[in-house]
Amino acid sequence: MLKNFCITMLVFCLANVSAQNNLSFLNDSYSGINSAVISPTQPFLNPNPWDANLLSADVFLNNDYAYISSQSILGLSNATIVTANPNKNISGENQSNVLDFYNKDKANLLFGSDILGPSFSMSARIKERKYVFGIYSRFRTHASVLDMDNYFRFNNERVSEPNDYTFKPVSGTVMNWGEIGLNFAKSIFPESEKQWILGVNVKYEIGLDAANIIGKNLNLTSSEPTVTQNTTLRNIYATDYDLSASYITNYNFQTKRYEYKQNGSGIGLDLGIAVIDKDKREEKYNYKFAFSIVDLGYVNFKKGINHVFKDGNTIWLQNNPVFENRKFDSPEEFFQTLSSEAYDDANASLQDSGFKIGLPTSINMNYSQRIKKNHYINFNWIQRVPVFENSVKRNNWVNANYLIQKEAIGFGVSASLSEYKDLNFGGYFRIGPLILGSENAFPLLFNHKHLHAASFYMAIKLYPFWDNEMKRHRRQKCDCEK
């Protein structure tokens, strides 16, 4: 039961893994509407008059809790993975294809996916000024847990759990949601020597699934089992606890099917400003500095289920016959059983329905410098700044990349720091309508002793990649008499 209890906390917390956008491609001037999600001003820099995204997907994972030994992401398709078992001498340190666990004091996990559906942007000149309008559809998953006490490390190290252990406060959030966004960008300050750009995204949020767990206090005590109990496991009890869990899901646990419906709604806002230095006769800039704050807002799940466990009975977690070898058919059955142990009432922990989840607010800065024709070096900094209570959190990210970008082809290489400590290398390749990339490419292709992170990006777009700057100049109206 202890493992069920902790795994439930992890699932509810770890589900907040933040999707990491492919910054190398999004720095490409031809990224168009795809770049609006991280910088509302970037579509303004697209030389093409229109741009359409058919489908793009970005998946990001990073954790220091578990790993697969001596494997790559591509190699997983043909691998048989077994879980570490110290009693059988199965360990990731002595064989490959083992799901094993780090024995660190703290556990961290960041995961996310970001799918951009049919989206479109176009530019227009109104009273001799350029405006860009766009609309996009998006499906997002964010989940994370940061600095959670790793109680499992005692079992992993084959040592007895301490007689008394107090968890430090922890919280975690996970959310699946859809998004319909409107992008608008225009130039401002026309008298300035530099070109200033203002960009805005207004978003309608469609809540699908969410979970949030807050652990303000939890104390675990352990003692030796009696001769009639499982002598390989110590008895573990929860005391002095103050825990709350909220969730809502479209997964039907009876039919074991996902049944799509909207469970929440909200409004989101992205704001951005950029300044560029360029010759008015050229499309390409000399340098650019952009700042944006994205994902201001929250999703309200009015019918969400809330459970609170505080100041109840001592809960026997491990070796308790009520829990051992029992399979729970749904989260609600698990919480009702836990409530019976805590309060002698299956419904005592149930509270008023409804909760809110904040969007993964972050500030983003970008500096781009042209080195020579079609060659650019870019620096990006993304810092999470949660605004609302119970917000999902994205990962902090520092990225530098070198790009070569032309109308029909573009490519680049990058180096990144995730959470300011994990160094990753990657890049992207764009040819016509196809874009492939990764900000952490090595785990995709090469075996890692401890495979614990990965990143992949793919997009299919329609845009006039057959066009070029000379053709566009020829089509412009000549102002020869002035």
Describe the residue ranges of each PLM region:
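Sec/Tat signal peptide C-region and signal peptidase I cleavage site
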Residues: 15-19
